[in-house]
């Protein structure tokens, strides 16, 4: 008897090289009040036991605010990775790498908390998160 195959996911997303992981400290690119955050989780990651979950451009992550306004500090919030230092390859063959690692804080529903994103964001983020693209200054 043939083995039963796994069903295809509802959406197909090319896996981008993961440049960050749980424990990474990342700059905040928006004006939500947070300045520096630490990644503490990657929702939806299913991996091997004790493997540190990785995250890349466009991924939703759970972060804790380390530096920022007194109202934002010590809060656990969700964020989307908009820039990463590690180079990743696009389908057209070009390689993209940013100067820093950065996230944008979002609500649990996925709407951005800030009203502007400073610096460039990746095209992959703009395609996956249209609301972030609306408040971004530059899309690369």
Swiss-Prot record:
One of its GO terms (cellular component) is cytosolic large ribosomal subunit. Keywords: Ribonucleoprotein, Ribosomal protein, RNA-binding, rRNA-binding. The keyword Transmembrane helix does not apply. InterPro entries: Ribosomal_uL14, Ribosomal_uL14_arc, Ribosomal_uL14_sf. GO terms for biological process: translation. SUPFAM superfamilies: Ribosomal protein L14. CDD domains: Ribosomal_uL14. It comes from the Archaea. GO terms for molecular function: large ribosomal subunit rRNA binding; structural constituent of ribosome. Binds to 23S rRNA. Forms part of two intersubunit bridges in the 70S ribosome. Part of the 50S ribosomal subunit. Forms a cluster with proteins L3 and L24e, part of which may contact the 16S rRNA in 2 intersubunit bridges. Belongs to the universal ribosomal protein uL14 family. This is Large ribosomal subunit protein uL14. The gene is rpl14.
């Amino acid at each position: 008897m043939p083995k039963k195959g796994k069903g295809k996911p509802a959406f197909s997303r090319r896996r981008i090289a993961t440049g960050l992981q749980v424990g990474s400290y990342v700059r905040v690119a928006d004006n939500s009040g947070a300045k520096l955050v630490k990644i503490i989780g990657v929702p939806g990651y299913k991996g091997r036991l004790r493997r540190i979950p990785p995250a890349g451009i466009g991924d939703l992550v759970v972060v804790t605010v380390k530096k920022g306004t007194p109202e934002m500090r010590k809060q656990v919030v969700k964020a989307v990775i908009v820039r990463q230092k590690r180079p990743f390859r696009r389908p057209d063959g070009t390689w993209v790498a940013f100067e820093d690692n950065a996230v944008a804080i979002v609500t649990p529903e996925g709407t951005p908390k800030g009203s502007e994103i400073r610096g460039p964001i990746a095209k992959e983020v703009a395609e996956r998160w249209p609301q972030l693209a609306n408040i971004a200054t530059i899309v690369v």
